[in-house]
A protein has these predicted regions:
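C-terminal scaffold of the Radical SAM
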Residues: 2-14, 26-247
Length: 247
């Protein structure tokens, strides 16, 4: 409801009817919306009826192209056959599924609520609901992740033939549980480049830990991703994003 109220307030702001301390006015004259992205958070916690209301509010304020690409992020742990069909009927034309890894151990380490099998079920539910444009989010350079494990994740996803694949390298952000556990390790890797170059006391400190991949391993994962996806016909359109021709 709050999001819908914000959308509905845009015409007033554009007409100069917003408070002095509000954001600068928008000039919407002549603008047509070609893409809409509903991100999160976890938008797939919303029922399809709520998504339909949000899109209706957008159309009341903006001129939306009839064939606009409308993307919604979805967590595989929350997407069901019924909700996938509901989102498609509500007007969503593209789903972005956050798999991150095909390794159960790596998923647990990331604190994800879904399993590999749940992702498969969600992907199939999306296809059955009529989604012919699906993105899968992946994450490399995870603690304890080997090049072989990353290659297995890529193989698993490529076999499903999604239209888009996003492959991001992990960034350990301050204020996150991962930073609490790996913040010092990140700083030491940035300083020394790899574990072999660290002082003996640090090598001993990290011995036996699920260590973050060093810079060379991270780079190898990136190049393997780029090479593998290119061979399968995916084109890179941003640094970490790949798509089949026409998408």
């Amino acid at each position: 409801d709050q999001l819908i109220r914000e959308i509905e307030s845009i015409p007033e702001e554009d007409a100069g009817q917003c408070p002095e301390n509000a954001a600068p006015r928008l000039n919407l004259t002549g603008l047509t919306v070609e893409t809409i992205f509903i991100g999160g958070g976890t938008p797939s916690l919303l029922p399809p009826s709520a998504v339909e209301r949000i899109l209706a509010a957008v159309r009341q304020v903006f001129r939306v192209e009839p064939d606009a690409e409308i993307t919604m992020e979805a967590n595989p742990g929350t997407l069901t056959p019924d909700s996938a069909a509901g989102y498609r009927n509500a007007g969503v034309s593209r789903l972005s599924l956050g798999l991150q890894s095909a390794s159960e151990e790596e998923l647990r380490l990331l604190g994800r609520i879904h399993t590999r099998e749940q992702f498969l079920q969600s992907f199939r539910a999306a296809r059955d609901a009529g989604f012919d444009n699906i993105n899968v989010d992946l994450m490399s350079a995870l603690p304890g992740q080997s090049e072989e494990s990353w290659q297995e994740t890529l193989r698993f996803v490529c076999d499903l033939e999604p239209e888009h694949i996003s492959a991001y390298s992990l960034i350990v952000e301050e204020g996150t549980p991962l930073y609490e556990e790996y913040g010092e390790m990140c700083a030491d890797l940035e300083k020394y480049g790899d574990y072999a170059s660290m002082p003996k006391r640090l090598q001993t400190k990290y011995e036996g830990c699920k260590c973050l991949p060093d810079e060379e391993t991270d780079r190898n994962m990136y190049h393997h991703t780029k090479t593998t996806l290119a061979k399968l016909g995916y084109e890179r359109y941003e640094i970490s994003n790949y798509a089949r021709p026409g998408y």
